[in-house]
């Protein structure tokens, strides 16, 4: 029975992996400004806006840039929304009890993927509590929580494969340009660093006491901790 179950599980995963539509380049799923503020809005490349609708308990909606074609696409409460040409990625932030008489809570703060064209049931990329999800090409970088290491820096493929810890320090991957993630130090320093998602290496960009870097074009914006966060 165990062998059969394992075989079925592999078949489901293999089928899901084969169905995934991968990106051809290092597309980024949202802007730093949005992701630092819970990512409740996201504009896809075609102009479609995905957002947590405050008029419907922050459920996931879409609309055109002119406000037309308002559509509810999921009953999930959505945060840290990202989008590419094929999928919406978001952190499900559902209340503990979502249905009358419910006594079980499953995957209420999980990392999810939803097909933009079909709007079918979301696929779980990580069932653990997640935050600050950010799409980089064919991977999602985010903060993952578990009872062993608590909150750490993680990555997972957009097909749900190869979920693993990148660093034990909970760096927030909000500012992304192509294959690079810009972040500030958390424990040993507060410098601004650049993480290369191809080589899994980091290099120093700016030494100082800084917070929440956001790269736009050739300019890095940040808060200066020693000058009243200006």
Per-range role (PLM):
Residues 57-61, 70, 75-85, 89-103:
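Post-signal peptide N-terminal segment of secreted/secretory-pathway proteins
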Residues 36-44, 75-85, 127-137, 168-178, ...:
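Repeated scaffold domains used in trafficking and secretory/extracellular systems
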Residues 50-52, 89-92, 141-144, 182-184, ...:
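Residue position within the beta-strands of beta-propeller blades
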Residues 1-10:
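Hydrophobic membrane-insertion alpha-helices, especially the h-region
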Residues 57-61, 96-112, 148-155, 188-194, ...:
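Structural motif
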């Amino acid at each position: 029975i165990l062998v059969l179950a394992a075989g079925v599980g592999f078949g489901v995963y293999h089928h899901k992996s084969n169905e995934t539509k991968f990106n051809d380049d290092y597309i980024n799923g949202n802007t730093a400004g949005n992701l630092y503020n819970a990512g409740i809005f996201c504009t896809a490349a075609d102009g479609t806006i995905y957002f947590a609708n405050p008029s419907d308990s922050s459920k996931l909606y879409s609309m055109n840039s002119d406000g037309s074609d308002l559509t509810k696409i999921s009953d999930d409460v959505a945060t840290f929304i990202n989008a590419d040409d094929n999928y919406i990625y978001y952190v499900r932030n559902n209340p503990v009890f979502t249905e009358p008489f419910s006594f079980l809570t499953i995957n209420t703060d999980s990392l999810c993927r939803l097909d933009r064209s079909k709007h079918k049931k979301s696929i779980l990329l990580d069932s653990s509590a997640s935050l600050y999800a950010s799409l980089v090409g064919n991977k999602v970088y985010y903060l993952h929580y578990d009872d062993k290491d608590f909150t750490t820096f993680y990555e997972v493929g957009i097909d749900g494969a190869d979920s693993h810890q990148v660093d034990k320090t909970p760096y927030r991957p909000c500012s992304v340009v192509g294959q690079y993630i810009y972040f500030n130090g958390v424990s040993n320093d507060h410098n601004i660093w650049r993480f290369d998602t191809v080589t899994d290496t980091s290099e120093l960009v700016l030494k100082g006491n800084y917070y929440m870097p956001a790269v736009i074009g050739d300019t890095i914006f940040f808060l200066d901790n020693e000058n009243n966060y200006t």
